[in-house]
């Protein structure tokens, strides 16, 4: 049963309503920042162990630096190596066959430094779970690549559509390629004024569009947002019209710009140095991020984390629609610019805003999630020989959620 929330209309359209009138009045400059999603950025780094006394390339003179071509394009890696040699010509570079060996060689002091694409940091975590906190970058290079428009556009004011929302596990630039840590399907029917928010666990075992093999859904983001959208479209058996993407910086910045949020915590637990108590709790950006990421504290970790992500998003929605924020939301709009992107066009967004202003309609929304069973197994597309945690989809859950999405699209 859909729950009626008066004029609180859903995560997506509420955000648009809060920001929309300001966007229109201030022109398209901020909106263009959000909708200009035509590039992706790969962040390469030469890293050493954090305990190392090495802090610059000049301290690696005549030493060998290992890198891996297991997933990267040789052309891009050669470009990065050439840039590093311009900085320090005496550097030598050797190839390691796998990311697993690359990490082991660094930790075993076989080499003092390795060159990596940080999108693949998760590949090291099987053997070195705290990899990201145990290394430091001493040199970096970013490669930007043009991305073709992969949206399937419709007339958003009178045709049902789907938006995929991705939360990537990085800080900094929103265009950085990384794993997709949060995965939500937003199904919108502008005719019936219904919205369905469906979450999918990051470790869901699905066929990746680029690899044609199964792996955890989060790894689809390594090849860019277009690959995750294709993967999800194939899994759902329907078009995904648009996508929107946020990262850790986005969440922290947006929550803090809102002056914090009030979350209805469902159980006592601790995570990330923060303590959460049953009941309503005020959270700042970092507290909200830790709350929405934690899974190890719970027996049903992945499913609980998905619910907490929805809790945080709904708390943000409620705060956005409060009179205190509505009368002072230019700071929120400024915060969003640069840490949120979508391939919806500016005209699509303004059309939705104008529709809502004109009809002042009440919307209904429903929250659902795909479920499954957690297993430890080998065979994933990216790390086939490593025994990793995956969530095997529950067939009944898949059928139920696919039908729910179809029902909203079909006006039921």
Predicted segments, located by residue:
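N-terminus-biased targeting/localization segments
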Residues: 10-17, 64, 83-84
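Conserved small/polar residues in nucleotide/adenosyl-binding loops
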Residues: 2-5
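Transmembrane alpha-helices and immediately adjacent membrane-cytoplasm interface residues
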Residues: 11-32
